[in-house]
């Protein structure tokens, strides 16, 4: 499964909504597709053969437990999210790391260049209630991060840029979560990760944080690293950082 080629729907009442999405993403409308974006009455999901339906979720109920793990998380120690700090998640994926950062009060802008993943993220944002919106400041732009950064004016530079590149596919095992398997197959390797890191260093106020496999050599020598069990967070400081 490398591409999603269709939009499906659970019942005929959802056909019009599914057709609009299919037109928007230039996909076919196919109610019987076994691999597709799948519209249900509750939410937009990703339907993949041999997997249960997958979807993005930004409800505070879901993420309050992860916040409860506190600042011991490598992600939090590396990014140091606090109320009002602006974080650009340049490779949003399922939006899970962005959601965790937002629970600590950060203002997080997600970028996602894959149109299918961007559609799933947008749907998750649209399902939030007022309490979710107040507690987690999340927004989304469906864009390639490199193009977005080139268009950014200096006054709009984020405090932190967070990058979680899709690395070369790991060995298939039960240890690789289904969401990661899907991203690996759908998106593939981010071969422009090095370019993105270098560009980010000239478009950020405080630091660039890169999530990378623990046993894999960093793309660039970091200024600092925070180790986890299977991943680490490499930290890069811009030359003229004031922080």
Swiss-Prot record:
InterPro entries: 16SrRNA_methylTrfase_J, SAM-dependent_MTases_sf
Chief localization: cytoplasm
Gene Ontology, cellular component aspect: cytoplasm
Catalyzed reactions: guanosine(1516) in 16S rRNA + S-adenosyl-L-methionine = N(2)-methylguanosine(1516) in 16S rRNA + S-adenosyl-L-homocysteine + H(+)
Record keyword Methyltransferase present: yes
Residues that bind S-adenosyl-L-methionine: 112-113, 164
UniProt xrefs under HAMAP family: 16SrRNA_methyltr_J (MF_01523)
Protein name: Ribosomal RNA small subunit methyltransferase J
Species of origin: Legionella pneumophila (strain Corby)
Taxonomy of the source species: Bacteria, Pseudomonadati, Pseudomonadota, Gammaproteobacteria, Legionellales
